[in-house]
Structure formats: C-alpha cells, structure tokens
Amino acid sequence: MLKGVSLYLVGMMGSGKSTVGRLLAEKLGYGFVDLDALIEQVSGKRVGEIFEREGEAVFRDLESRVLAEVSAYTRLVVATGGGVVLARRNWGYLHHGVVVWLDADIETLLGRVEHEPGTRPLLAGGDRHLRLVELLGERARLYAQADVRVSAAGLPPAVAEETLRCLAARLAEDSAP
C-alpha cells in the first residue's frame, strides 16, 4: 500500500502512538521505531531525566537529531514524541513519509496517562487535566498539518485498522486523476 514509504505517527501523549505503531508495523511488514526509546538508547538517559537535568530545549534538539537519522530509512513505522511537531525543521524530516495524527479527546488521554505516573515529564506536578488541555491547545494546529487524521479513542487494534483504512482512502485520492 505505502510502497516502502515510512509512516510517522504524531499526537498527544497517551494517544497510543507506540502501541498502535507496533500493530501497524506488523500489519505492513515494516520495522518499528519508538523515537523516545531510541533517544534514551542514544543518550543513555531516560527522557524524564533529560528534561529534569538538561531541560526541554536540550531534549528537543536531541529529538530533532535522532529524527533526522531515522528519516533516512524507509519501511518504518515511527512513533514520535508528542512535541515533535513543535520544531519547524522536524516537519522536513516527517515529510519523508506519511504523517498520521492519532487524535484523542482529553478524557481519553487523561485516562491513559494516569496509569503511567512519573513517565510524562511535561505532566509532572500540578493538574494533569489542565496541562493536557494547555498542551493540546498549543499543538492541535500543528498536528492538523498531518496527511491523515485518525480518531484514537478506541482500542489499539481498532485504531490500527482505522489508520490503514484512512491511509488507503488518502492514497486513492492522491492517485486519482
């Protein structure tokens, strides 16, 4: 279907990018890359540790450099970090493939991230609901630049199937005369 073109999943933390990404990679016969996990492997530090000790700017720079390396490859499903869309230069890397926004409402996101205390540095301390609303407010217009938008409110297998359906429809549109 994608003829080797990589797939980049964007969206808020808790939207299911990593879980859905693994399912999509399996269905497409692609490799899977979790960008945050790769950043941890390259840096030897947890994402939260980078945020805490070195700051978000250092993390975002590292994220861009790792994304640049990954974008040189094909036949990958890449689960990006929620803030990857914030840096303009990252869009150049993302557009080496097809960009899919896994979109979920705040209540769905909150329900998912509440089960992962301590793993979301941008939600540390304070009201998680309010912080998610703020982050989505900052990022929604950027996520909307994706090639395809898919509701991520369902269970991961259903979201993966819907993603494939939406991709097929979009690719059919693009190839129509």
Curated annotation (Swiss-Prot):
Keyword check for Nucleotide-binding: yes
Main EC class the enzyme belongs to: transferase
EC numbers: 2.7.1.71
Cofactor note: Binds 1 Mg(2+) ion per subunit.
Binding residues for ATP: 14-19, 120
Sorted UniProt keywords: Amino-acid biosynthesis, Aromatic amino acid biosynthesis, ATP-binding, Cytoplasm, Kinase, Magnesium, Metal-binding, Nucleotide-binding, Transferase
GO terms for biological process, alphabetical: amino acid biosynthetic process; aromatic amino acid family biosynthetic process; chorismate biosynthetic process
Disulfide bonds: none
Protein origin, superkingdom: Bacteria
Amino-acid positions noted as binding Mg(2+) in the UniProt annotation, renumbered to this chain: 18
This protein's pathway: Metabolic intermediate biosynthesis; chorismate biosynthesis; chorismate from D-erythrose 4-phosphate and phosphoenolpyruvate: step 5/7
Entry's family note: Belongs to the shikimate kinase family.
Quaternary data: Monomer.
Protein name, per record: Shikimate kinase
Lineage: Bacteria, Bacillati, Cyanobacteriota, Cyanophyceae, Gloeobacterales
Gene: aroK
